């Protein structure tokens, strides 16, 4: 699946994904609008308008609904940014054709697995040598979603494959509308839907961490085969501004994990 051509800029109204997520979250919790109203302190009529996408929710209303529905921090931040998209946001950028040399020098100076990625399309735009060793095949020719679902090596590398892929697929479903062009979403959906787990991952909510302070994943060491517990960190550049994020995997700071990762 090629993803380097310029995308059609037909992006969904950013308020509709907010409406859809809140409605699905309420229904999954088994709450009526009246019951949610009692918990959130918002009238049922306003909840209905927000869920229909006919009323843009204020930050106060969103916060009240998030608290009442126990929305994970990962999705809270994204939905708040979507609510401001018509004033401050912009659609997902095209894949850059050239990465500045300074960015590549920084990337290659990191001894642990690191890559530059575009969110929320999971495009990989550059990798270092450690990334290539730990995640074979996950390079600029594919996306993280396609690699996880379609490349058999991902199931060997990711020791918590089901949990992590479920979270990524559901995150793509929630966070791409309103940001990523619909044509691009449809193409990624079609490419990944051949995986037998796709429907379950797409239609059911995963066990999302309540906080994001220590996202730990177990990765198989490429040489020894040992399980290495690593924290994934996503770094956004403020100066200079960049359209991509620096994604790194670092071993936990206990001696056994550090020694295994450094072998």
Regions found by a protein language model. Give the residues of each.
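Hydrophobic protein-protein interaction segments
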Residues: 101-253
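Short amphipathic recognition helices of helix-turn-helix/homeodomain-type DNA-binding modules
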Residues: 1-5, 60-98
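Residue-level signal for the short linker/turn that defines the boundary of a DNA-recognition helix
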Residues: 20, 30-31, 57-60
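A short, Lys/Arg-rich alpha-helix, primarily the initiator
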Residues: 1-28
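Short, positively charged
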Residues: 11, 88-104, 197
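Short alpha-helical DNA-recognition segment
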Residues: 28-49
């Amino acid at each position: 699946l090629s993803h380097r051509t310029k995308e059609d800029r037909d992006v969904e109204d950013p308020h509709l994904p907010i409406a859809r997520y809140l409605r699905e979250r309420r229904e999954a919790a088994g709450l009526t609008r009246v019951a949610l109203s009692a918990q959130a302190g918002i009238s049922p009529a306003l909840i209905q308008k927000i869920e229909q996408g006919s009323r843009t929710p204020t930050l106060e209303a969103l916060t009240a609904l998030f608290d009442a529905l126990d929305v994970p921090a990962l999705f809270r931040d994204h939905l708040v940014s979507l609510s401001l998209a018509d004033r401050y946001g912009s659609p997902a950028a095209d894949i850059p054709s050239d990465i500045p040399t300074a960015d590549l020098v920084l990337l290659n100076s990191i001894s642990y697995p690191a890559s530059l990625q575009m969110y929320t399309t999971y495009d990989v735009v550059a990798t270092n040598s450690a990334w290539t060793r730990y995640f074979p095949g996950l390079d600029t020719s594919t996306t993280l979603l396609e690699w996880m679902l379609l490349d058999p090596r991902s199931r060997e590398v990711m020791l918590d494959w089901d949990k992590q892929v479920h979270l990524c697929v559901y995150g793509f479903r929630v966070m791409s509308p309103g940001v990523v062009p619909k044509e691009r979403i449809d193409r990624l959906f079609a490419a990944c839907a051949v995986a037998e787990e796709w429907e379950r991952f797409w239609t059911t909510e995963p066990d999302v961490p309540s906080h994001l302070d220590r996202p730990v994943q177990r990765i198989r060491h490429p040489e020894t085969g040992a399980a290495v517990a690593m924290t994934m960190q996503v770094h956004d550049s403020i100066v200079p501004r960049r359209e991509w994020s620096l994604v790194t995997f670092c071993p936990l700071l206990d001696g056994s994990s550090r020694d295994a990762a450094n072998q």
